[in-house]
Amino acid sequence: YQLFHMHNYTYFDIANGVCHKISLDLSLQRNSIDNPIYTRYGSQFLASVSFTPPYSLIDGKDYSKINDPAERHKLIEYHKWKFQGKMFFPLTPLPQNNGPKRTPVLMTRVEYGFLGYYNRHKISPFESFQMGGDGMSGYTNYDYPTELIALRGYENNSIAGRSDQNATPYAYAYSRLSMELRYP
């Protein structure tokens, strides 16, 4: 359970209101890396799903006629699917017992995320994605109930951001494919 209490909040659709989120989160993870900080070989995989009860399918309300975002999202509903995979490949033979412990490593990554809804008139601004930036905070500077997907070379909140006043600042799906050459 999570409670969002907004009071004069200027960076989100809901300036004043209370929103409730009850969700069930399930994940399946596999990890075979040799070192969590300076990884030289192995892989990490994560598949997860998070969903809330479909309130709009059982409460009988017509959400197409509710204009107040605080009332429309009083009970947050969504289903969120994510997959993340990383593989680490040493580019030179791994050092033996007394040798140096460093080797160049190629890291490949694939990530996908999707945020779905039960009612097209009640699409949740909560739990959406915003890409760009360092990802150090785990959330965006503007909309705390969104997930920041780090992407090197871009500023925070710059890809699914507020560049156009008429565009939605939220992304409901993303994919990230990358390769990095590392020398730990």
Question: Which sequence ranges carry the predicted segments?
Answer:
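C-terminal outer-membrane beta-barrel translocator/porin domains of Gram-negative envelope proteins
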Residues: 5-184
